[in-house]
Swiss-Prot record:
Disulfide cysteine pairs (residue numbers): none
Annotated spans, Disordered: 284-305
UniProt function note: Involved in the synthesis of fatty acids. Elongates C4 fatty acids to C10.
Protein species of origin: Trypanosoma brucei brucei (strain 927/4 GUTat10.1)
Name recorded for this polypeptide: Fatty acid elongase 1
Catalysis: reaction(s): an acyl-CoA + malonyl-CoA + H(+) = a 3-oxoacyl-CoA + CO2 + CoA
UniProt keyword list: Endoplasmic reticulum, Fatty acid biosynthesis, Fatty acid metabolism, Glycoprotein, Lipid biosynthesis, Lipid metabolism, Membrane, Transferase, Transmembrane, Transmembrane helix
Localization: Endoplasmic reticulum membrane
Length: 305
């Protein structure tokens, strides 16, 4: 890592990923409760918000937005702090996990970097800390959805909540079973989120017209992440089950889940990219209804319109 504050160094040194794993295994029902509560909020939250402000959903949406469509001043400032915090968090994770992946690729080749499972690297040391925190961070990232509701979203996009809940369940399962290929997931996701959440923070600060041209490129990077994820997963499964396979430090069930997850993301993100940037819908007339889709971890263009 380029710089590690002393307090963070102590957290890394004291991290006991094996104990965290054992707790997650013993309390696997917790992630199910969180997921069910989250899904309940997805479908009830917008309607509840409309009732709390004492009006219909359409009027609530209009009242929740400022003139530039990014939300009330309090919501907007909170979004800046939240997204900036997630970006900084992701930068720290990237600076720790990604160099290890690159070093493994250089020293061990693609097979070694993907299939050589080291328990110490996965559960202990500073790398293990950022792998574990990555898995657990999928819980607080659900707060993204709260901000969409506070901005007056009447219906949360499928890609938004599907992405959040599936990656949460997958990350919990992966940290419980251990996976040599998970370093790819963490390194890529940390890297993409470093840029994506910084984009959201700048947009909420009022610079959306400046950063908006970057939106399609960030989405392209997200799609490339899914392509690489599919390839890594298929490679691991081939080494595990294929004729002449050398074995791989992964769980077969976890890899099947990972493949379904990445393949579905690839389809959904690609479909969204085409709809947003290749065949975008006509913009509403001035003074007409807002076209904000508010897709966190989805179309960055739509989130900040």
């Amino acid at each position: 890592m380029f710089f590690t504050p002393p307090q963070l160094q102590k957290l890394e040194q004291d991290w006991n990923g094996l104990a965290v794993r054992d707790w997650m295994i013993a309390n696997v029902d917790v992630v199910l409760y969180i997921s069910f509560l989250y899904l309940g909020f997805v479908f009830i939250g917008p309607k509840l918000f409309a009732k709390l402000v004492g009006t219909n959903p359409a009027a609530a949406a209009a009242g929740a937005r400022s003139a530039d469509g990014t939300g009330s001043p309090i919501v907007r400032r909170s979004m800046v702090v939240w997204n900036l915090a997630l970006s900084i968090f992701s930068i720290f994770g990237t600076s720790t996990v990604t160099p290890v992946l690159l070093r493994n690729l250089a020293n061990k080749g693609f097979y070694g970097a993907t299939c050589d499972f080291k328990e110490t690297e996965f559960y202990t040391t500073n790398v293990g800390f950022w792998m574990g925190i990555f898995a657990l961070s999928k819980i607080p990232e659900l707060v993204d959805t709260i901000f969409l509701v506070l901005q007056g979203k009447q219906e949360l996009p499928f890609l938004h909540w599907y992405h959040h809940v599936t990656v949460l369940l997958f990350s919990w399962h992966t940290y419980c079973v251990g996976s040599s290929a998970y370093i790819w997931v963490a390194a890529m996701n940390y890297s993409v989120h470093s840029v994506m959440y910084l984009y959201f923070a700048l947009a909420a600060l009022g610079y959306k017209r400046v950063v908006r041209p970057l939106a399609p490129y960030i989405t392209i990077i997200q799609i490339l992440q899914m392509v690489v994820g599919c390839y890594v997963t298929i490679f691991a499964l081939q080494e595990l089950h294929g004729e002449g396979g050398r074995g791989c430090g992964v769980s077969p069930a976890n890899m099947r889940i990972q493949l379904v997850m990445y393949a579905s993301y690839l389809y959904l993100f690609s479909k969204m990219f085409v709809a947003s940037y290749i065949r975008p819908p006509k913009r509403p007339t001035v003074g007409g209804p807002s076209s904000t889709a508010g897709v966190s971890n989805g179309s960055v263009e739509k989130k900040v319109k």
